[in-house]
Amino acid sequence: MNFSLLLKPVSSACNLTCRYCYYRGEEPPAAGGGSVSPRMSAAVLEATVRAYMQTAQDVYTMVWHGGEPTLLPRSFFAQAVTLQKRCAARGARIANSIQTNGTRISDDLAAFMAHYRFLCGVSLDGPRQMHERFRRAGAGGGTHAAVLAGLARLSRAGVAVNILAVVSAANVGRPVETYRYLKSLGATHIQFVPCVEYDARHKLRAHAITGRQWGRFLVAVFEDWFRHDIGAVSVRLFESVMARLVHDIAIDCYNSAACNRYLVVEHNGDVFPCDFFVRPSHKLGNVLENAFEEMRGSEAYRNFAAGKQRWGAVCAACEFLPLCMGDCPKYRIPAENGAGRTSALCAGWKAFYGQTLGRFQRLADRLKPGVHADPR
């Protein structure tokens, strides 16, 4: 089965101190422009690329993540590309992408990404007041202007960009304003990610959102997108719904049947099944010692993957289960009636699907061969 790699060459090191970061507190922020520790060694990088290229993939997809991967110099990514070319079989297709906070994009790095066709995901939560409420620099300063400057450099270089917006207490009450602002910057690919974090007492953190807020946000964005932007703007979550309705496939983790779409490779070569579960108890092995297929075939990995379908009676009886598949296990909390675990976003998903599914289905019907329907 195809799988991608999410690589963390600097682990959780970052030049920002975003309040909602789920790695917050695990590593001290790296000094701006200073040396980075931890850092993926040349030996781990080569072992990772070589081992991955020995697996059978339709496309070899490597996602450079963090922390903040651009703390590393361009030469690191150039070495990665060189290794990919050296280790790949003739005709192999390779796709690189990088997820960045956008504050450290130089013209040189942008030109490199354009030349090697890196997809660049940039984190931007909306206008300055929304974005900077939780996304702050290491010294507490603003970050919005630096992100816009990075986006401008990427645009001039011709890099394909995907905007990733975290939906938090900062912007959840202003969905259309957030969406239209991102569009005004020229964004044609947008991904919304819910902020769901709990404290040690299992109380929702101040920056996090409730399921009902998530639902209202999605419905409002959908209404605006449906009126004005079908075919012009790709909202990842909407594409995910369409992929399920048209092709009966999952293109995202949250609505997949199993948690087995990718592996995480830490800076030291340790491998984990998911970025939300980088814990000693979930370690599958190390690229210096274990093959990827060995780790994917392990009982620990199979049990983790199968956990996606360990939902309770609430999910099993839900008409929308084929669309959300119980949501990401990270978001699951004990159901109030004790009938297993259900997503903290469940109420929002139900509201969203309940108000939009009919129109999604008409859009899907229009895309199916031999069917002609008015999506509106």
Language model features with spans:
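Radical SAM enzyme [4Fe-4S]-AdoMet core and its adjacent flexible, acidic
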Residues: 133, 137-145, 152-254, 258, ...
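Cysteine-centered iron-sulfur cluster-binding motifs in ferredoxin-type domains/subunits
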Residues: 10-17, 68-71, 259, 315-317, ...
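Flexible mid-to-C-terminal extensions adjoining Fe-S/redox cofactors in radical SAM and related proteins
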Residues: 278-376
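Radical SAM/AdoMet-radical enzyme domain recognition
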Residues: 45, 49-50, 54-63, 72-195
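Short, ordered coil/turn segments that flank beta-strands lining enzyme active or ligand-binding pockets
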Residues: 267
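Canonical Radical SAM [4Fe-4S] cluster-binding loop centered on the CxxxCxxC motif
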Residues: 4-43
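Extended hydrophobic secondary-structure segments that form protein cores and membrane-embedded regions
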Residues: 5-7, 61-67, 95-100, 235-237
